[in-house]
A protein has these predicted regions:
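Beta-strand-rich binding-surface signature
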Residues: 127, 168-170, 182-184
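Feature captures outer-membrane beta-barrel proteins of Gram-negative bacteria and organelles
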Residues: 47, 169-171, 175, 199-202
Length: 202
């Protein structure tokens, strides 16, 4: 098989200072596309037609897997041949196909965070950081039409796609208790489109 993959990525970031606060923001976009080409898979629908004897008409190419397809061959009806020979290129072309499977994934991610000093205590400044992040991921797979229809000798496959989004916020505190001793605390809230909300603290 042959696989052709294209990958794209865009990343942007910004860092600045507003008053005494450090602010940063970012945006990331990424996409992956691939096409998988597989040669030599059998078209089971055409095989049935080719082996159907007198019912193989029109564009159908008759096939006798037991031989009798050489230059001296003669079709005598009811799926029977006389003569010698082997399967011809025309027969192979009729009962095989070139499969094209496609897949794609895309991700979008953006957010910001702010950090600075919230207050001054005898032991030092109280540090704080908070921020927000959004991420969306989606993807899909599209098998070849013959494979999706169950007309292939390869593994069966069906089209599939899906996506999820998540929004997250966080808050972190660093509180000086004494010289060289800090008390830290943090909490993160996440809201997933796939299964709901979670809150984690430490």
């Amino acid at each position: 098989f042959i696989q052709d993959t294209e990958t794209y990525r865009l990343s942007m970031g910004l860092e600045t200072k507003i008053a005494d606060w450090d602010v940063s923001a970012y945006f990331i976009w990424a996409q992956n596309k691939n096409v998988t080409t597989t040669k030599g898979l059998l078209n089971t629908g055409n095989i049935k037609k080719a082996l159907s004897g007198d019912a193989c008409t029109g564009s159908c190419v008759p096939l006798n897997i037991f031989g009798g397809q050489g230059s001296d061959s003669k079709y005598i009806g009811d799926g029977l041949w006389t003569g010698t020979g082997s399967i011809t290129p025309e027969m192979v072309e009729y009962i095989t196909f070139l499969a094209h499977d496609t897949g794609e994934n895309e991700m979008k991610n953006f957010g910001f965070d702010v950090s600075g000093e919230l207050a001054q205590l005898p032991a030092g400044p109280v540090g704080i950081a908070f921020g927000y992040e959004h991420r969306k991921e989606e993807g899909g797979y599209e098998p070849d039409a013959f494979i999706a229809a169950g007309l292939s000798s390869g593994n069966a496959a069906s089209p599939v796609s899906g996506e999820f989004e998540v929004d997250e916020t966080f808050l972190e505190l660093a509180i000086p208790v004494a010289d060289g001793l800090d008390l830290s605390a943090s909490v993160r809230y996440s809201d997933y489109s796939s299964f709901g909300e979670t809150t984690n603290a430490k």
